[in-house]
From Swiss-Prot:
Residues 765-822 form a coiled coil. A motif ('HIGH' region) lies at residues 41-51. It comes from Mesomycoplasma hyopneumoniae (strain 232) (Mycoplasma hyopneumoniae). It catalyses: tRNA(Val) + L-valine + ATP = L-valyl-tRNA(Val) + AMP + diphosphate. GO terms for biological process: valyl-tRNA aminoacylation. A motif ('KMSKS' region) lies at residues 511-515. NCBIfam families: PRK05729.1, valS. GO terms for molecular function: aminoacyl-tRNA deacylase activity; ATP binding; valine-tRNA ligase activity. This is Valine--tRNA ligase. GO terms for cellular component: cytosol. Belongs to the class-I aminoacyl-tRNA synthetase family. ValS type 1 subfamily. It is an enzyme of class 6 (ligase).
Length: 822
């Protein structure tokens, strides 16, 4: 073995070997299963640090359970990522001078599949470098042929239960991507904008009502003013009419409990382009008319400003209203504005025909399950509460998207007829142009990837899956949808447990992003430090639900641990290996391994990886390296040390797969993934070794304190305690000491009194130091006496200062008397 840990030597082609030997091909279940469906990364680009973190956690858990004797399955997949991938492909085509509109739908989809294949190869290469134990014989793609059948079947089953409908409703519209998006794809951000206070004159009156709005551009779609029925200020006005400031038409004043009395003047204009406003219109049978088109421009409803961008038109409309006396004032405010998570453009609310999933019944089913004993266990627990709250206030889910790349909606039209089915009903039938929301297909992946609805072999063995590992940021996007979809289709929960981790941030707590320039490429880290080092740096800093503040120091710490393990293994491998029974030290070490294993088993159940990391670091640096290796240096035989090393490698394997596999192969000529988690004896007589270590530590501390050369034999004995000759021999060898009965200098430790015969060299040095101290004390006494006999000092100095000098003099004389007596 090389003198220094070389991760490139260790990790080269190791995952290739694991795959060739089929270590992670899930068998037909014969033992207890442990299964994870891996969150599918998007085929939009390469894996980032967050993907690596998630994959490492899953992989470590699967390896751990394999060593524990489980039948394991870690199923790999990638997501077609509808909107995101279509944008990437369009951008790629644009570089070649090709527009999406230049291609037929089928041609564009072929381009998307080509993109997917290219990106998937890159992702697989990255998985290989990470060392993830996927069963590639079962790999899936959210848009593969089986997935298309499953998604269409799911749609049809929801339709048959009257849980899917097509309706003209207010939806979130992405101006840039030209598609509908769901509510949870809208991110609210605080934005500085103008608040316009508009005058609405009462019919046939000079009195007016003041209405505050940030969306003056929607004024032409106003159909009413609304007040809260509990607001006594305006209750007498309900049923009356006001003059529309722009169109001069009369509109009604209505009462609705959704109006907030504390916002602005407490009067709300009811117009298109707000979900709340649309709900009020429906409740009061008011006609709605959009004044903004698909591209965010004002339409024919505002002839004077038709074609103007809605935000640019704000100032134009304000100037017109001010000129005509309908604008009271303008203020600058900070208020939340909805942005598309997909494009980062401001979302517009438009009323459009879309496909929706009715969520009431599905939400009730999920909440009911959360109230049962069979509910999914969330780590940390507080995310169960978050999920429950979200479902208690959930809206219907907009599932149609105006895209080409994705699952086509299985609905066919012919004249005024339509049919919901997978295949075309025949000639003249045209399929719906829209595709389904990406999360619609991802939401059934947990059972669809296992074969539903065509093959149930894997479902019988591995469903519900044991665990889902994912970031808390997609709890509502993905976890929630798999939950209710599984309850609806499979009539049971999708997984036993959900482990939610946080986000990876930089060392000052900022989210990593391209715009900030603080992102780190996991492949670049692996190229410099190795995969095991990156795994450690991420996993050993993981706690359920918590973010990681990542920095280079974490990588250095992880690399140092790998190097220490390498050095320990090399030392033991170089020892003689003739048969020998374990001695006291070996049994003590085995007990330390027993404690380590117990701590790992305890904490892995709670996914407390940071605690596991601390335990492993303390064990390697403390018990194994500083203690055991030091203790066995008193002998040349490493027979039992090798046995212990083998056990340690197996225990550490889930967290350091490459290094432990290499060392097992190199030293023991064995495959670590063919081993089982070792049984380890608990040793009750540890105190004897702890006593030896206590004596060694104190003798070493004494030697270091007085800088006594190792060439000088340290003579000592332990007062009123018996140590065997073998134990004394160990102490002597590791402290360069010699047992000698004496009572010259007694050191009290936690459990013992150690008598040390002070070396002559030290005595001489000590005597010289004491003579110098005596001379110093005498000179200080003379100085103090001179001051205290000075009349000027005694007359002018404050009483406190005189007393302080007298106290100093007394202490100096006491100290001098001590040294002279000595």
């Amino acid at each position: 073995m090389k003198n220094k840990y070389d991760f490139k030597l260790v990790e080269e082609k190791r995952n290739e070997k694991w795959q060739k030997k089929g270590f992670f091909i899930a068998p037909k279940q014969t033992k207890k299963p442990f299964s994870i469906i891996s969150p599918p990364p998007n085929v939009t680009g390469q894996l980032h640090l967050g993907h690596s973190w998630n994959a490492f956690i899953q992989d470590s858990l699967v390896r751990y359970h394999k060593l524990q004797g489980f039948d394991v399955l870690l199923l790999p997949s990638v997501d077609h990522a509808g909107i995101a991938t279509q944008v990437k492909v369009e951008e790629d085509l644009a570089k070649k001078g090709i527009k999406k509109s230049d291609l037929k739908r089928e041609e564009f989809i072929k381009k998307c599949y080509h993109w997917k294949e290219k990106q998937y190869l890159k992702i697989k290469e990255q998985w290989d470098k990470l060392g993830i134990c996927y069963d590639f014989s079962k790999e899936r793609f959210t848009l593969d042929q089986d997935a298309q059948i499953a998604v269409s079947d799911f749609f049809i089953k929801l339709w048959e239960k009257n849980l899917i409908y097509r309706g003209q409703k207010a939806i979130n519209w992405d101006i840039k991507l030209q598609t509908a998006i769901s509510n949870i794809e809208v991110i609210n951000k605080p934005v500085e904008q103008k608040m316009y206070y508009l005058k609405y004159f009462l019919e046939n009156s000079n009195e007016f009502l003041t209405v505050a709005t940030t969306r003056i551009e929607t004024i032409s779609s106003d159909v009413a003013l609304a007040i809260n029925p509990k607001d006594k200020r305006y209750l007498h006005l309900v049923g009356k009419k006001v003059v529309h400031p722009l169109t001069k038409k009369l509109i009604k004043i209505i009462a609705d409990s959704n109006v907030g009395s504390d916002f602005g003047s407490g009067i709300m204009k009811v117009s298109a382009h707000s979900i709340l406003d649309f709900e009020i219109m429906e409740k009061h049978n008011l006609e709605s008319k959009d004044c903004i088109d698909n591209y965010g421009n004002l339409n024919h409803e505002v002839p004077e400003f038709q074609g103007q961008n809605r935000f640019f038109a704000r100032d134009l409309i304000a100037k017109k209203l001010e000129k005509e006396g309908f604008l009271a004032k303008i203020e600058t405010v900070i208020s939340n504005v909805g942005f598309s998570q997909r494009s980062d453009e401001i979302v517009e609310i438009l009323k459009k025909p879309q496909w929706f999933v009715k969520m009431d019944e599905l939400a009730k089913s999920l909440i009911s399950h959360l109230n049962s004993k069979d509910k999914i266990k969330f780590y940390p627990k507080n995310f169960e509460k978050n999920l429950r709250k979200w479902f208690e206030k959930i809206h219907d889910w907009t599932i149609s998207r105006q895209l080409w790349w994705g699952h086509r909606i299985p609905v066919w039209y012919k004249n005024d007829e339509f049919k919901v089915q997978i295949d075309s009903p025949g000639q003249g039938w045209i399929q719906d142009e829209d595709v389904l929301d990406t999360w619609f297909s991802s939401g059934i992946s947990v059972f669809a990837f296992l074969g539903w609805p065509q093959n149930f072999d894997l479902i019988k063995s591995y469903f519900p899956t044991s665990l889902l590992v994912t970031g808390w940021d997609i709890l509502f996007f993905w976890v929630a949808r798999m939950y209710f979809s599984s309850l609806f289709i499979m009539k049971q929960k999708p997984f036993e447990k959900v482990l939610l981790h946080g986000l990876i941030r930089d060392e000052i707590g900022r989210k990593m992003s391209k715009s900030l320039g603080n992102g780190l490429d996991p492949m670049e880290i692996i190229e410099k430090y190795g995969s095991d080092t990156l795994r450690q740096a991420l996993i050993f800093n993981s706690s359920p639900g918590k973010d990681i503040k990542f920095n280079i120091e974490k990588l250095n710490t992880a690399w140092n641990l790998n190097n220490k393990i390498w050095n320990i293994a090399k030392y033991i491998a170089d020892l003689d290996t003739f048969f020998a029974k374990p001695d006291l030290i070996d049994l003590w070490m085995e007990n330390k391994i027993y404690i380590l294993k117990r701590q790992i088993v305890k904490n892995i159940k709670k996914y407390n990886f940071s605690v596991i990391g601390t335990e492993i670091n303390n064990f390697i640096y403390g018990d194994f390296s500083s203690r055991y290796i030091e203790l066995i240096k008193t002998r040349k035989n490493g027979f039992y040390a090798r046995k212990l090393l083998r056990k340690v490698l197996i225990i550490l394997h889930p967290f350091l797969p490459f290094l432990t596999d290499f060392l097992m192969e190199k030293i023991f000529k064995m495959e670590i993934l063919e081993q089982k988690m070792p049984r380890i004896r608990q040793f009750k007589e540890n105190q004897k070794v702890e006593n030896i270590l206590e004596i060694i530590d104190n003798l070493r501390t004494y030697r270091e304190k007085f800088q006594i050369s190792k060439k000088i034999i340290l003579e000592y004995c332990i007062i009123n305690d018996k140590f065997s000759n073998a134990e004394i021999d160990i102490i002597n060898k590791l402290t360069f000491g010699k047992w000698l009965e004496n009572k010259e200098l007694v050191i009290k430790t936690k459990n013992f009194e150690i008598a040390i015969k002070v070396p002559e060299e030290l005595k001489k040095e000590q005597k010289g130091r004491e003579l110098k101290e005596i001379q110093f004390l005498k000179s200080e006494i003379l100085r103090a006496e001179k001051i205290l006999t000075n009349k000027g000092f005694l007359e002018k100095a404050p009483r406190e200062k005189i007393d302080l000098e007298r106290t100093k003099l007394e202490k100096l004389k006491e100290k001098l008397a001590f040294y002279e007596k000595k």
